[in-house]
Amino acid sequence: MKISVLASDLSDNATGRADLLARLLSSRYEVDVVGPQFGEGLWAPSRDGPVAYRSVRAGRDPGFARHVPELLALVDGEILVASKPRPTSFGLGLLARARRRRPLVLDIDDWEVGFFYRSGAWGRVGRALNLANPNGLPWTWLAEKLICRADAITVASRFLERRFGGTLLPHVRDTEAWDPARYDRADARARQGVGASKVVMFLGTPRGHKGVDDLIDAVGLLGPGVVLALVGVDPARSGAPRWSGLSHVRMTGEIPFDDVPRYLVAADVVAVPQRETMDTVGQVPAKLFDAMALARPIVSTSVSMIPEILDGCGLVVEPGDVPALAGAIKRLLDNTEEAAALGQRARERCEARYSFRVARATLFPLLERLTARSR
């Protein structure tokens, strides 16, 4: 049986969750990921991986509609899994199901409408009038109103579960493949040119709500001998030129997802300093689970589900509190035994709750029930 995973834009980091869903499903089903590509090329971390992608190059303008028939022709699975309640993924799924009846699962890993609230009242007015963007506020709001049309819903956080219902399916990692014993820490440190310095690492797309500026300031308070490695930074992004000029910051560009362990094992501490905003209220950073799988000591913030996930296996501080963030990082850098114990407990938690095995035990029965009902 084939499953089509529908992604909203294969050129940006929204591809990450679609890629994860495809990897989870591929042990039992034939799977590919289908979606529009609004930018240049497939999102870099997903290139050259095991997931099959089929895309249509499109623009964020009224002309997008003419590409819909091309996209629908690619949606040939017996089951449809739409990643995110956006018009260009879930909306496409609704159209595909209308053409040929088949189960449609909607996976929600962010509160998409919440992203538009960060701009304030006048910003929302401007975005509400932007009818040209197929994933703009008016159409995303409409897609959210149609969530009840899905045959099943999976959600990545408690906030999303309360708001939309459905089955909790957090971000997970392949803890068998991501065994820290398989990766050479000395080689990882040499690759990033950190010498004998202690390494605090942030891995991922460094957007404002992810607290990267807070982290840069916090590590700057720790003095010489500690460097901040930012891995996955597009050098053209806002902020990147300024960060690269700081003596305590090392920057690495976007890397393939399957290379993440080869970089992350270099970290003495992994920091996930989410800010508390409308962007993050429903979000759980996927990179948290990278660090957990690889037994890295973690410092994060009390946003969304993070305190629940890291309870007893990581340090959590208030969001936006730079001195507290610096203090928690320093504590782990100075107390290596505590750091190692927390890292090991984080891996054990990941294996028990946030592994491919656990996610498949949730996802596969859900799909089996749907296909049984549709026969």
Annotate each PLM feature:
Residues 190, 331, 338-353:
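A short, well-ordered alpha-helix in the C-terminal region of glycosyltransferases
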Residues 210, 256-263, 268-292, 300-308:
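Nucleotide-sugar-dependent
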Residues 159, 172:
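Carbohydrate-associated surface elements
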Residues 173-191, 239-241, 373:
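Acidic anion/phosphate-binding donor-loop and adjacent secondary structure
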Residues 4-6, 193-210, 216-220, 229:
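Conserved donor-binding/catalytic core segment of Leloir-type glycosyltransferases
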Residues 36-39, 173, 203, 227-240:
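Glycosyltransferase donor-sugar binding loop
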Residues 238-264:
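Nucleotide-activated donor-binding/catalytic signature segment of Leloir-type glycosyltransferases, i.e.
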Residues 312-322, 331-337:
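Conserved acidic donor-binding segment of nucleotide-sugar-dependent glycosyltransferases
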